[in-house]
Amino acid sequence: MGGVCPKIKSIFRRNGDDFMIIVIDNYDSFTYNLVHYIGEFEQDIKVIRNDEMSVPEIMDNNPSKIVISPGPCTPKEAGISVELIKTAEVPILGVCLGHQAIGAAFGGNIIKAPEVFHGKTSSIDHDGSLLFSEIEKSYDVVRYHSLIIDMKTLPSELNVTATLSDDKEIIMAVEHINRPIYGVQFHPESIDTNNGTKLIENFIKKI
């Protein structure tokens, strides 16, 4: 959950091949931090606001992968994010609000977190999912959110791949059981998140 950045514009840079990443911007100030991290590994990026195009119009762009950004709202208010998760047949990474949208897309409840986190550093433990390849099993991440996916209503289609180190009931990452859909509650694009660049690299190069 970040602040609103109302004048973000779409960018589209071709690099001579057919690989292209679409970033769904949920009107968040962190979106272009995320784009910057993605740009370290793939320069062909298109940023589309969550109410700028329909899902069919987005898919007509033939994205290779989709990243759904953080945002200051709930999944229900995140434009086409939830519908896109349900229907797109390409790898998806959801960050913060994007992660919550994954939970909502498959029927999970999105509930208030035990406390509001704004720039808080927490330790997480992960299970070795491909998204966390070559990353130590416990490490520190930065969190900006007031909502979480409810562990008690976690959809059967999703596996938990990371939790807080000190509270295993707080979901920090999920993965779909048979589709390349991944969500992280924390902000890999924050400078104070360890291994954030590596996580983005894993999504782009290994998934």
Model segments located where?
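Cysteine-nucleophile active-site neighborhood
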Residues: 19, 63-134, 200-201
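Conserved hydrophobic/aromatic beta-strand scaffold that supports enzyme active sites
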Residues: 121-123, 171-173, 183
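Catalytic beta-strand/loop cores that center a nucleophilic Ser/Cys/Thr
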Residues: 130-178
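Short, charged N-terminal beta->alpha structural module
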Residues: 21-41
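Short, Lys/Arg-enriched N-terminal segments with co-localized hydrophobic residues
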Residues: 7-19
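Acyltransferase
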Residues: 190-207
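Short amphipathic alpha-helix with an adjacent loop that forms part of the alpha/beta core around
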Residues: 54-62
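A short beta-strand-loop structural module common to alpha/beta enzyme folds
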Residues: 44-52
